[in-house]
Amino acid sequence: MKKAVCIMSGGMDSTLCAVMAKREGYEIIALHFDYEQRTMRREKMAFEQICDYLGIKKRLNLDVSFIADIGGNALTDKNLAVSKSGLGDEIPNTYVPFRNGIFISIAAALAEKEGAQAIYIGVVEEDSSGYPDCKGEFIERMNAAINVGTAPETKIKIVTPLVNLSKADIVAKSLEFGSPLELTWSCYEREDEACGLCDSCRLRLRGFERAGVKDKIKYANLS
């Protein structure tokens, strides 16, 4: 059976990617990262619940806390306030330097070891105005580097099925494919209830609103 490493944060995008990979007939190897982010425990809980829901047996939760040691972002540095400035073109302080590059590199090592043919990652161009490691060009070049830097018989494709979708499209497709949106977690700041104010919450809420669907998770603030 063909295999895919799915990088899964516990959020709605990566969850839909895993659902889509499963529909494509892949055996899923779920990969989650703990990097001392503010909502690390809540994201890990979402990851485990989603894997249970999807019947994913092979799952790996890796400690990459060196990312917090590098610092420079509000997700790991509690001295920085999480950006609530809006969804503009500037790189926000929630950008974790080269995070997707680090994650993809580790996923490539796992894929090579497991003999997997694909890496699924839920990057979305709509998010990429401020996140350079979400852009299609970045993914293409990472894919080329992986296939140069692995054994000759290793052929891995990075699959980004959501890259050209809007958040509303992602909500609609999640409902169409039976992705468990109610188990996913997007908030950057809180673990009890989603804050409703951070940029990630606002992107999520805007997606549900434009899709004409109510989000079932609880929010502390709804404007």
UniProtKB/Swiss-Prot annotation:
Residues holding Zn(2+): C187, C195, C198, C201
- Which Gene3D superfamilies does UniProt cross-reference here? HUPs
Q: Which UniProt keywords apply?
A: ATP-binding, Ligase, Metal-binding, Nucleotide-binding, Queuosine biosynthesis, Zinc
**Which stretches are annotated as coiled coil?**
none
Reactions catalysed, as given in the entry: 7-carboxy-7-deazaguanine + NH4(+) + ATP = 7-cyano-7-deazaguanine + ADP + phosphate + H2O + H(+)
- One GO BP annotation of this record: queuosine biosynthetic process
Pfam families reported for this sequence: QueC
Please give the positions of the paired cysteines in each disulfide bond: none
List cofactor names only. Answer: Zn(2+)
Q: Which family does it belong to?
A: Belongs to the QueC family.
What NCBIfam families does this protein map onto?
7-cyano-7-deazaguanine synthase QueC (TIGR00364)
Protein name per its UniProtKB record: 7-cyano-7-deazaguanine synthase
